[in-house]
Amino acid sequence: NQNKSRRVFGKPETFSVHFPDKAGKGGKAMKRILTAAQMKQADRNTIETMGVPSLVLMERAALSCVEELQNGTWDTGKVLAVCGPGNNGGDGAAIARILKTKGVDAELFCLGNPEKYSEGMRAQKKIAENYGVREVKNPDFREYTVIIDAIFGIGVSRPLAGEYRRAVEAICASGVPVLAVDIPSGIHTDTG
């Protein structure tokens, strides 16, 4: 079970990455990668202009992650979604819930002050609990076959501190494969 990552280099305004051509012709297709500001604007436009609720965006993100987890390259024997206080955490709670409905042993480890959770995180956590997803405190990350990094997404631009830093360090030290929602927590969206 190898976790491969793509590295992208360039100025934030001009990030692009090469992917194999989907037509199978061996060529290269270019995909534009947005900056954090551009991605936030795209989310805002989708919600405010197009009328797509934030919870629908979370559900779509969660479904995409579940699809990746079930592509045959991940061992989903026991999954832990490590959730931050924002909508990225809500994505993680939704992933755990969807996995649970598919018979996967999925649990939540929620960081931050529950009184400061985003509306989306509160809603997705409650739904996950209603589906029987258990929240754990002080997990031994080595007990899991996959960890979902849903701590922070594109919105964070400062170094990790406190319980967030400790969680990321423990996840890294565990050696367990990690699937990050949006971007690995602690990585600056524009500069890497």
Feature names for model-found ranges:
Residues T14-A29:
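Short, Lys/Arg-enriched N-terminal segments with co-localized hydrophobic residues
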Residues M30-D75:
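Positively charged, low-complexity intrinsically disordered leader regions
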Residues M30-L34, W74-G192:
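Glycine-rich phosphate/dinucleotide-binding loop and adjoining beta-alpha-beta core of small-molecule
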Residues R6-R7:
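Basic polycationic patches enriched in arginine
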